[in-house]
Amino acid sequence: MLELAQELEELVHTSLPQAKGMSLLFKADGGHGGTRVGLDESDILPFHATSSGIAMLAFGDPEFRRKTLASARPQFTKETSVSEEALEGMIAEAQLNGFASVHKTYEDEVSSVAMPFFDQTGHAIGTIAVATPSSRMTPEMKSRIIGLLSQASMTLSANIGGLIPQSFRNALIAA
């Protein structure tokens, strides 16, 4: 992950699901010389307002997703989707593409892209994400992040003995 952060010069982090959001497992700052995104180790990233949360809901346990969708969702920015219908649309888009992407939904000037990593049964158990100031999330940068994250997701899953579901592979090929 450190290599990924250095290559992109952006914040890369892995997170695991908890009852109320995604808990930071590891982070690496790519050292961009200008404005940076920061995360505190104690932060809990909300499922509905972060790419990590959306990716987890898209590829995680369906029962967990159902329970999460039934809970209250606070509005963090004017871009935060709080309706169940909007959230289900974001989840479906992530399933179709193999990744979740958000723009100014948790913090006003932050965009991010996340993908799941999988356990030995092929279920998502966490996410790997890149967060960047929104001004740097150009279409070219997003495409580059997606390519590098797909490699990182597969490598991380393989390193923990995970099985990559064919539906995830197909989504990445189609995206």
List PLM regions with ranges.
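Extended hydrophobic
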Residues: T80-A152, N170-L172
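Amphipathic alpha-helical effector-binding/dimerization core
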Residues: M1-S71
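Intrinsically disordered, low-complexity polar/acidic regions
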Residues: F76-T77
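Intrinsically disordered, low-complexity terminal regulatory regions
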Residues: M1-D29, R144, L148-A152, L156-A175
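Short intrinsically disordered coil segments
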Residues: S71-R73, I145
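Generic alpha-helical structural context detector
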Residues: I54-A58, A92, M154, A158
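Short, hydrophobic secondary-structure boundary micro-motifs
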Residues: K67-T68, H103, P165-Q166
